[in-house]
Amino acid sequence: MKLSFLSLVLAIILVMALMYTPHAEAKAWADADADATAAADADADAVADALADAVAKIKIPWGKVKDFLVGGMKAVGKK
């Protein structure tokens, strides 16, 4: 059975495609994983920055807290 030139070219293309496809798929998965990791890191950094800003804005009136605690201690009989 003789192969025509076109059949030979198609066979070579098929073999090359079969050899290259797993490599391309693995590379695509690796790139997607790296992109997902980078996006998750960016989200975590944004949340941490927002939380730090929120905590920095909280003003605790320590004098009132102390008065409340001292008053509570006196109410139960402790100095």
From Swiss-Prot:
Q: What is the protein's given name?
A: M-myrmicitoxin(01)-Tb1a
Q: What else is known?
A: This is the most abundant peptide from the venom of T.bicarinatum.
Q: Which UniProt keywords apply?
A: Amidation, Antibiotic, Antimicrobial, Membrane, Secreted, Signal, Target cell membrane, Target membrane
Example GO BP: defense response to bacterium
What the protein does comes down to:
Antimicrobial peptide that shows antimicrobial activities against all microorganisms tested with minimal inhibitory concentrations (MICs) values ranging from 0.45 to 97.5 umol/L. This peptide kills the microorganisms by permeabilizating the membranes. It shows a very weak hemolytic activity (HC(50)=325 umol/L) and weak cytotoxicity against human lymphocytes (LC(50)=67.8 umol/L). Gram-negative bacteria tested are E.coli (MIC=24.4 umol/L), C.sakazakii (MIC=5.8 umol/L), P.aeruginosa (MIC=8.7-12.2 umol/L), S.enterica (MIC=5.4 umol/L), and H.pylori (MIC=0.99-3.9 umol/L).
Which branch of life, at top level?
Eukaryota
Reported modifications of this chain: The C-terminal amidation is important for antimicrobial activity, since a non-amidated synthetic peptide shows a reduced antimicrobial activity (2-20-fold depending on the strain tested). The amidation may play a positive role in the peptide conformation, since amidated peptide shows an increase of about 5% of helical content.
Q: Which organism is it from?
A: Tetramorium bicarinatum (Tramp ant)
Family recorded in the similarity comment: Belongs to the formicidae venom precursor-01 superfamily.
Subcellular location(s): the record lists: Secreted; Target cell membrane
One GO cellular component, as annotated: extracellular region
What the entry lists under InterPro entries is as follows:
Pilosulin
Give the Valine amide positions (modified residues). Answer: V76
Signal sequence, renumbered to the chain: 1-26
Tissue-level expression? Expressed by the venom gland.
Its predominant location is secreted
